[in-house]
Swiss-Prot record:
GO terms for molecular function: telomeric DNA binding. Part of the HipHop-HOAP complex that recruits the MTV complex to form the terminin telomere-capping complex, which binds to chromosome ends in a sequence-independent manner and prevents telomere fusion. Telomere capping is independent of the origin recognition complex (ORC). Residues 115-337 are annotated as: Required for binding to Su(var)205. A motif (Su(var)205-binding Pro-containing repeat 1) lies at residues 231-237. Keywords: Chromosome, DNA-binding, Nucleus, Repeat, Telomere. Changing S144T: In strain: Canton-S. Changing S154T: In strain: Australia 2, Kenya 38, Kenya 43, Peru and USA 3. This is Telomere-binding protein cav. Transmembrane segments: none annotated.
């Protein structure tokens, strides 16, 4: 019983209004698309295929056709068609009258709009005529569906029965193709979702278009130029090996080019491994005068940069002892008294 209510099984007769309406539509289409123009052949052919005729409306449905239509066709109801309240709703929402309002207030506004004739209900005759047009169009669409489904069934039955595997393989191929297409669409939607989730709050995919522009490329090239122009003699402080002598008193810093130049020029000088008033027996006393190209530090000011532990240049440690021509040991930047070498011996 429910299936019979879904589609009207009996054929219907075309009314005078519907006949006139279809004739007017046909004239409008043929006036717009002339038959003399070869570019309009496809449009006119489609119009002939989709045009509603009296034979279409008079065609009755069988029980199998009604069942198939009810099972394979979705029923759609447009509640906004020829509804004056829907038009009033659009007008009120355009003015913002329903913002943060209760349902009771909204219903009262609908009644007020109809009472003051802001909108008027459609006449019943007009609604009946429009429903007749929609019913005729729906029946034409249902006939096209049934013909298409019947054609597919006849093609499957007309195929040779000796090759059922071929039909199965063809169906599997079509099914796999559809599955692949659905998979591609789903993967594309997932990728778009991840890109948005990764974006910061309040920032859209269009606001990230500035990444990788000329400004960032100039900044990156500036970093590269800075690394290229860096002196070759610069030593990374992490690569300097130091003996554990007064590490707590050392002040970390960067090695400038002047300290590096002094380090190059004094590679042949003796190394002092002990600080204080005693000298290592392995050290040969020589003059510690700096070369001309080396920068001398004042007695009251020391360079805060450091190089190796054997030549520490800091405020808390002396550079190293030296012996003058009279045989007296002195320490630079310290207030210790001179020591006589003869007395030590």
């Amino acid at each position: 019983m429910l299936l019979l209510l879904c589609v009207n099984m009996s054929g219907t007769q075309m009314s005078a209004f519907l006949r006139k309406y279809l004739a007017d539509e046909d004239k409008k289409i043929r006036a717009q698309f002339k038959e003399s123009d070869p570019n309009n052949k496809l449009i006119l052919w489609m119009h002939e295929k989709t045009r509603i005729t009296e034979e279409d409306l008079a065609r009755p449905y069988t029980e199998d056709e009604v069942k198939e239509l009810c099972l394979r066709t979705k029923v759609k109801v447009d509640m906004t068609a020829w509804n004056c309240l829907w038009e009033a709703k659009k007008r009120f929402e355009a003015k913002g009258r329903f913002v943060n309002k209760s349902e009771r207030f909204i219903n009262r506004m609908y009644m007020k709009a109809v009472r003051r004739k802001m909108v008027q209900p459609y006449p019943e005759e007009f609604v009946a005529q429009r429903r007749e047009i929609v019913a005729a169009e729906t029946k034409k669409q249902n006939i096209s569906r049934l013909d298409r489904w019947q054609k597919k069934k006849s093609q499957n039955l007309s195929a040779p029965e000796s090759s059922p595997d071929a039909h199965a393989s063809s169906n599997d191929a079509v099914q796999s193709h559809e599955d692949q297409a659905n998979t591609n669409l789903s993967s594309l939607s997932q990728m778009n979702f991840q890109v948005e989730a990764m974006a910061p709050p309040g920032v859209s995919s269009s606001d990230l278009s500035g990444i990788g522009d000329d400004e960032d490329e100039q900044q990156q090239s500036g970093f590269q130029d800075e690394n290229i122009n860096r002196p070759e003699t610069e030593i990374n402080e992490n690569s300097v090996r130091c003996d554990p002598i007064n590490l707590g008193r050392m002040r970390t810093g960067c090695i400038n080019s002047q300290a590096n130049n002094s380090f190059r020029n004094t590679e042949s000088d003796p190394d002092y491994y002990m600080f204080g008033t005693q000298l290592s027996t392995l050290v040969r006393p020589t003059s510690t005068q700096e070369p001309d190209d080396q920068v001398n530090c004042p007695e009251t000011e020391m360079n805060e940069s450091w190089v190796r532990c054997d030549q520490i240049n800091s405020e808390s440690l002396s550079i190293g002892p030296s012996i003058d021509s009279e045989g007296t040991i002195t320490f630079q930047n310290t207030e210790s008294e001179p020591i006589d070498v003869t007395s030590i011996a």
